[in-house]
Structures are given as structure tokens and as C-alpha cells.
Amino acid sequence: MALQGTKRSYEQMETGGERQNATEIRASVGRMVGGIGRFYIQMCTELKLSDYEGRLIQNSITIERMVLSAFDERRNRYLEENPSAGKDPKKTGGPIYKRREGKWVRELILYDKEEIRRIWRQANNGEDATAGLTHLMIWHSNLNDATYQRTRALVRTGMDPRMCSLMQGSTLPRRSGAAGAAVKGIGTMVMELIRMIKRGINDRNFWRGDNGRKTRIAYERMCNILKGKFQTAAQRAMMDQVRESRNPGNAEIEDLIFLARSALILRGSVAHKSCLPACVYGLAVASGYDFEREGYSLVGIDPFRLLQNSQVFSLIRSNENPAHKSQLVWMACHSAAFEDLRVSSFIRGTRVIPRGQLSTRGVQIASNENMETIDSSTLELRSRYWAIRTRSGGNTNQHRASAGQISVQPTFSVQRNLPFERATIMAAFTGNTEGRTSDMRTEIIRMMENAKPEDVSFQGRGVFELSDEKATNPIVPSFDMSNEGSYFFGDNAEEYDN
């Protein structure tokens, strides 16, 4: 991946590395996922899981959550200082599903966090391997993005539920570092900032004293991350205003909501990475694949190829459709919750349908669900083609303003138009153009009005056959221009609740 200026590629962010060349990046990303795989194999041994049980995505998620919880310093400290009934701050665990007499049974397991940390470090050459932990967080975040709608969270912060395409990474923990920041959508950053400003309005001491100084630094850092995602000068200038405000308040909230709306057409750059469940890396390592030697990339053919050759199972409730469950997990694996369904369908080779039409609930099974009626099936995670993941937002004409559709943040670098309802979006921009940001607002609105829904993004970019690992022959799909495809339209998905 070409590095421009001081920008680090996301493989570098992912591995915490300094500037490296492509081969070094591939090796360090390989080392990271290889470590995850080795850890997973060791955990399966500890838990005495059969091969089949080890391929169960629900078991994978429990094991991933255990290691994330074992390394969550802040929460561990909090739990030790505020002991709550029935929670041992030194232990972590969750449901593990095993096959007994032709039925699935749930076993609740409990482990010392210290022990989990030891196994993780041992799998990662004695290091803490924070990059691997972040990678697991991003996989969980991508799964949440595909499974839940954030309508309630959007409404609470004064944003419009139709802006859900800006909400990538909204469930990522704060501690997810640079790699986490890279995959957060515009709406996610705006929401974090608005929450912060609201606290400042309600709590006089929020910006004051020693703590307030730290808060202020965090605020400015978040503003800079958001500014870096915008691609037009006017949007960036508005972010400078928000950042430099002496005492952030309602004016800043207004500006941020304005900017979030503008991002529906003047899209920001948001990174996309294919982060797979730990069991997939475990399967590959167990079969003798050496990730570090072979190298690995999160944004190229590698994850597609890995999924072509992995068999993963999932528990299925009696009223769920296994094909729909597969679609959900496929989207999560490729970070494609906010991609145009026309593009996803083309790459996957089977029709990808909107969330509201899926007969499936989330992947995880609640502790009060009856296991008697639960069966398992194979997840179909293979694809017909592969495509390069993008971080550009797909704006046409030299990364300037372009067409966007309420509800798409492109994942794949594939030529298409990005249809949008200009009337719907522009309706939100009547009113306030006075105040210190008036000229920037006027400029942003002008750019949005000039955007054309039929403009083509990612000119000349196509998908590739799975045999074409060097990406030499792009196949440029032709899409029905009038027919947009957004995943959350007309939707009744469950809400995400912490």
C-alpha cells in the first residue's frame, strides 16, 4: 500500500509499527493474526473443545471476549475498587457450547484473568500484543454494525436515525487505539464529541482543574481525528472552529450535527478492514499455515482466501434462516454493513438483502434462551470475487464533493455511482447559516448542491477473480444506476444495548 506523507497505512496502525515497507507490514500483520490463532488453539485445548466445537462462532466470541476482558486494565481497576456483588474482579468467563448426546448444551466457564493473560502472551512471543486485541475489538464492532441499528443512540444525541451509515465503529471501546480510530465513522466521532460537550454543559467542573486539562486534551485529539476524516477544506475549517472553542457548548453541538449531515454527501474517509473471528485464524494455524512467513493483509485478497477454505459453524434458533445468518456474518467479516448492497451482492455472488428482511437475530445467544430448540449449521462465508477495501469514502472528482446516498459508506474499491436523495438530505440544511461558521456552512451547502447522484466513484476499479491474487485483471461490474441498495432501509433491526 502506498504511503503518502506522514500518513501511516492501517496495517501500521494495526500493528503499532513505525513506517515499514509493504513486506514488513505484511509480516507484522501476519504475526498479529498468527498470534490470535495460536492463542485460540491453546484455549480450545484448555477447554477440551472438539474440532467441531472449536469451529463454533459462539465459542470463538466467548474466548475473544475473555481475553479482551482480561486485558481491560481500566475496568479491572474499577472492579477492584468498587467490588460489586457476584463479580470476581480477578476472573473472566462466559458461555461455552458443547455437543452432548446430539444436543447443544451451554456450560458457563470461569478463568483467572491472570491465566488468560499468560496464555495470550505465550501465544504472542511473550508480548502483550495489543494490536491483536484491537483486531478482535474491530471484529466485534463490525459484527455489531451488521447486527444492530443505532437509532436510539442517534436520536439521544440529536442526530437523525437516517444517518446510520455514518455510525461504523460506534460500539468500539475507547481503548482501541489508532487502528480503532481509523475505522470509526463520522457519526461515531460526532456522537463521542457531543456526549463530551453535553457533560461539560451539565457539569461545571468537567473542563476545570487537573482532570479538566486531560479532558481538554482528549477533546482536541478527538476533534483532530474527526477533522482528518473530512476531505473538503470547509469541513476541516469548521472542525478547527469546534476544536478551538474556549468553552464548548450548544453552538459546537449544532456545528457537529451540521457536519455529520454534510457527510452524507461529502463523505469522510473511513477505513475498512476484514477482521475475522479468532477461530478462523486458529484453523489456519492448526493446519500448518505460517502467517508471519507468508504475510497477511486486512485489505486485500488474504481474508477472502482464508474464508474460502474455512468451515465455521453457528448455533441457529428454531425460527432463523441459516442463509440469513451467513449473510450477517459475511458482512461483519468484511466490514460491509454500510456498503451498497449491489456491490456486496456482486462480490459475494449471492444476493445480499436488507437487514429488515433477514430472518435472523444476533449471533450471540442470551443466557436465558432455551438450548433445547437450538441447532447448528454451517456458515457460508465464501465469495465469488474479491475486492480491495477502501478508506476514501468514494468521493469523485479529486476527492472533492461527490454524490452520497443516505446510508452508504463504501467498503470495497469498486466502480459504481452512489445514488442519494438530494431533496431528503438538503431539507435538513434550511435555516441557520449565520454565526462564526456561516461562510463555511454556505460553502459546504454549495458543494452538496453541486453533487450529482449519477457521478461515478472509484473510476475504473473492479473486483478480481479469487485466482488473481496480484489484482491484475479488474472486472468492472455494471450496476443499475437508479437502484440504490442500502442495508438499513425500511428496517426493524434490534437496537444495540450495552
Curated annotation (Swiss-Prot):
Late in virus-infected cells, may be cleaved from a 56-kDa protein to a 53-kDa protein by a cellular caspase. This cleavage might be a marker for the onset of apoptosis in infected cells or have a specific function in virus host interaction. It comes from the Viruses. Keywords: Capsid protein, Helical capsid protein, Host nucleus, Host-virus interaction, Ribonucleoprotein, RNA-binding, Viral nucleoprotein, Viral penetration into host nucleus, Virion, Virus entry into host cell. A motif (Unconventional nuclear localization signal) lies at residues 1-18. Its main location: virion. Disulfide bonds: none annotated. Residues 1-22 are annotated as: Disordered. GO terms for cellular component: helical viral capsid; host cell; host cell nucleus; ribonucleoprotein complex; viral nucleocapsid. It is found in: Virion; Host nucleus. SUPFAM superfamilies: flu NP-like (SSF161003). GO terms for molecular function: RNA binding; structural molecule activity. One of its GO terms (biological process) is viral penetration into host nucleus. Homomultimerizes to form the nucleocapsid. May bind host exportin-1/XPO1. Binds to viral genomic RNA. Protein-RNA contacts are mediated by a combination of electrostatic interactions between positively charged residues and the phosphate backbone and planar interactions between aromatic side chains and bases. Belongs to the influenza viruses nucleoprotein family. Encapsidates the negative strand viral RNA, protecting it from nucleases. The encapsidated genomic RNA is termed the ribonucleoprotein (RNP) and serves as template for transcription and replication. The RNP needs to be localized in the host nucleus to start an infectious cycle, but is too large to diffuse through the nuclear pore complex. NP comprises at least 2 nuclear localization signals that are responsible for the active RNP import into the nucleus through cellular importin alpha/beta pathway. This is Nucleoprotein. It comes from Influenza A virus (strain A/Chicken/Hong Kong/FY150/2001 H5N1 genotype D).
